[in-house]
Amino acid sequence: VITRTGDPMNPNDLGRVNLSNAKSIIVLDSDDSGDATVVSIVLAVKAVNTNPNLKIIAELDDANTAEALSTATNGQVIAVRSHDVIARVTAQASRQPGLAAVTLDLLDFDGDEIYFQDVPALTGKTYRDALLAFNDASVIGLVHANGNTELNPKHTTKIGAGARVIAVAEDDDKVVYTGVSDVVANKKIPTPKAFTRKAEHLLVIGWSSMGRSVLTE
């Protein structure tokens, strides 16, 4: 880990870190200054950056600011509303026991993780084919050549040139194309049972800025 001291809103200081050669840039929200500082830093980064493919991930609070910043930079800035994400995960974890453990397992390096992999052999095939094409990985979605991401799209979705698969695997070297299988499980597909929604009773103790988002979720 190499650190540098300086003002992230000062282009001269940013020039010392050779940011154009970075894979991506993360701009964190300061606890006391909020979105205004994040926006200023992003603008300073764009003024110095010479790499048009560089992605900037910015932590923001306000939804309107996040959308405006992403639109103004033609998608180069990926806005992450961290408090909103935490609130939504908190709400879902309270309703679905075990979800928190699954989320942590996917985000840390102890278990399986999510990987994005180029698989030219799948070009022209369908998402259904992709589901059956990996022995040691589970495909969960696609990233199309235009950058659009689809999680669990329709099985008939065609995989175009330049698309990548999103897969859950033990390591990136486990996401290996093993060929499209024609084997279909010779089992009777069970008829889904009718689902009746029941009232849930949850207790919220205390309150914070995330409270409204938790209740909405």
Say what each PLM segment does.
Residues 1-217:
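Cytosolic regulatory regions of ion transport systems
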